[in-house]
Amino acid sequence: MNPCQIFASLVMSICCHILSSTAWSVNNFLMTGPKAYLAYTSSVQAGAQSGIEECKHQFAWDRWNCPESALQLSTHKGLRSATRETAFVHAISAAGVMYTLTKNCSMGDFENCGCDDSKIGKMGGRGWVWGGCSDNVNFGDRIAKLFVDALENGHDSRAAVNLHNNEAGRLAVKATLKRTCKCHGLSGSCSIQTCWMQLADFRDIGSYLKIKHDQARKLEMDKIRMRAGNSADNRGAIADTFSAVARTELIFMEDSPDYCVKNLSMGLHGTEGRECLQSGKNLSQWERRSCRRLCHECGLKVEERRIETVSSCNCKFHWCCTVKCETCTQTVTRYFCAKRHRNRRPHNHSRKRQHTRRG
């Protein structure tokens, strides 16, 4: 089962099973989803793919690195969790689907959708008017909500948390929109501008949601009222808890497990054997500290390995019409987390640093 299939199923419903013997099918989802929206299935799948790629990028140097095994396990009802990481998965899923639907809409890929022209000709501010082709985020929001939220049919606190994080992901797409303008006027005077709203790069949305993940808020539900199950008391407790939470915030209910330690029952492989970065150009502070975070703070040492890589080089074009290359071997130094000779307990403060914001 490839990453897109695993994550696409997760996008549709965290509570659905992923069958180990068969690939996930968009049609399977649509058996219970909105059948009127068959035209959008390829966009939904593409959005799911962009979601998993962005998740892996954002968490590449974190202890939890968006592993496919953990995503697959989290689709099983008995193994569902409502951690900080699950919150991000829901948000980036919803954002990816909405983003792709919006983009395809603006490109004219759907018969019933195009640019958002609701503001064209209206004054937007001093010296500029609305024009051009604004990305139709309201369309993307509406269809993504139907797809991603449709199968979250529970009425408990976990379902409410998932739906909240889905919405936070969609709001992230809107929050990162950029205004693009074109100048008009004699001799390039730019006396007036025509402006429209454009989707940001999806990487910007991923970074925005990563910050939201780092700042995610833990909910403390009223357990006495929650014992009533799906009763009015249950719904009242959920409503009271959510009343003070901003719609743009990511929320979770359970503390994250110790990602330093291998736990195969949860799909976690620990950080032993993980690569980290110690040097290199244009590294962020978060990347430069990855060896400390993944290795030292998990009771592991940093092991230096010299690895030979083979690649094509000195390529030349020969008339006509071939390109001939030489084969070059290069030795590079890479760093990995490895066991110490003596077992040492991880630093007590390592868990606290786990969700520190990137530098």
Swiss-Prot record:
This is Protein Wnt-8a. Glycans are attached at N104, N263, N282, N348. The gene is wnt8a. It is found in: Secreted, Extracellular space, Extracellular matrix; Secreted. Pfam families: wnt. SMART domains: WNT1. Belongs to the Wnt family. Its main location: secreted. Keywords: Developmental protein, Disulfide bond, Extracellular matrix, Glycoprotein, Lipoprotein, Secreted, Signal, Wnt signaling pathway. GO terms for molecular function: cytokine activity; frizzled binding. The keyword Zinc does not apply. Palmitoleoylation is required for efficient binding to frizzled receptors. Depalmitoleoylation leads to Wnt signaling pathway inhibition. Residues 1-25 form the signal peptide. Disulfide bonds join C55-C66, C105-C113, C115-C133, C181-C195, C183-C190, C260-C298, C276-C291, C295-C337, C313-C328, C315-C325, C320-C321. Expressed in the margin of the pregastrula embryo destined to be the future mesoderm. Gene3D superfamilies: 3.30.2460.20. One of its GO terms (cellular component) is cell surface.
